């Protein structure tokens, strides 16, 4: 373990966190998310944080009282795309130079391109990114919809039926379909069996809410994987976690039918009254589909890059 001291904050770098340190990061993330209305770390980062075998670099700043005041997670598993960065500062310790210190320590630690997510698109994050030479490269929108509003019931294409995902049986066929459906997606299309297994092991996993569209020959043609977010002190909310359609099945209304089926599941089987999803701003076809189904923009998540 070694330390650097940019600005007024002492930044410590390590390649491994012990369980109490991980708990401190999760506490910081919860405080930042409650203050900002958007969690600072995405699912990928949280999964890697809890995996003792996942390679990563961790930058931390502790206040004089020992509280974790700032944290940055560096993911170098995709060198072609650049090192992925997510960072957060505890609300109590903001406006003390900690965010800038972490960002500069990231730059001092990493050689090569950097890509950083700012969840919630807060003005302070945008200003810091621009000041440090990052450019706005990609935007994900979070859309939301009340489940109390009527849900359309579009028909499935002829011969197509829906059934639940079967863990251990459907894994390979689903991974192949996912790769086809997201061939141009920077993250989703590269999922491996380990990625699927990690999510199957999460407490929120619900095979009954992982809907598969199957043609008469038994081939998978599409899927709608739903998720329920449960957070103490906050109302539950459903998510269109991943929705995909085989390119050969495009244009037949399967995407709309799958979306509606998942929404009905979240409302009728899980008792939820609202749902959210994430969609790339550039995916105009998907945005249009979701808007027709009653979704509206809620927040933005911005990817910044620096060469």
Swiss-Prot record:
Record-linked Gene3D superfamilies: 3.40.630.30
Catalysed reactions listed for this entry: 1D-myo-inositol 2-(L-cysteinylamino)-2-deoxy-alpha-D-glucopyranoside + acetyl-CoA = mycothiol + CoA + H(+)
A single GO molecular function term of this UniProt record: mycothiol synthase activity
EC number(s) from the headed UniProt entry: 2.3.1.189
Domain (N-acetyltransferase): residue spans on this chain: 12-152, 160-307
Residues reported in the UniProt entry to bind 1D-myo-inositol 2-(L-cysteinylamino)-2-deoxy-alpha-D-glucopyranoside: 43, 187, 227, 239, 278
GO biological process, one term: mycothiol biosynthetic process
Keywords, sorted A to Z: Acyltransferase, Repeat, Transferase
PROSITE patterns reported in the protein's UniProt record: GNAT (PS51186)
Keyword Transcription regulation: no
Signal peptide residues on this chain, from the entry's feature table: none
Binding-site positions, acetyl-CoA 1: 87-89
Sequence positions that bind acetyl-CoA 2: 243-245, 250-256
Domain of life: Bacteria
Record family assignment: Belongs to the acetyltransferase family. MshD subfamily.
Role played: Catalyzes the transfer of acetyl from acetyl-CoA to desacetylmycothiol (Cys-GlcN-Ins) to form mycothiol.
HAMAP family, alphabetized: MshD
Subunit structure comment from the entry: Monomer.
Protein name: Mycothiol acetyltransferase
Organism: Salinispora arenicola (strain CNS-205)
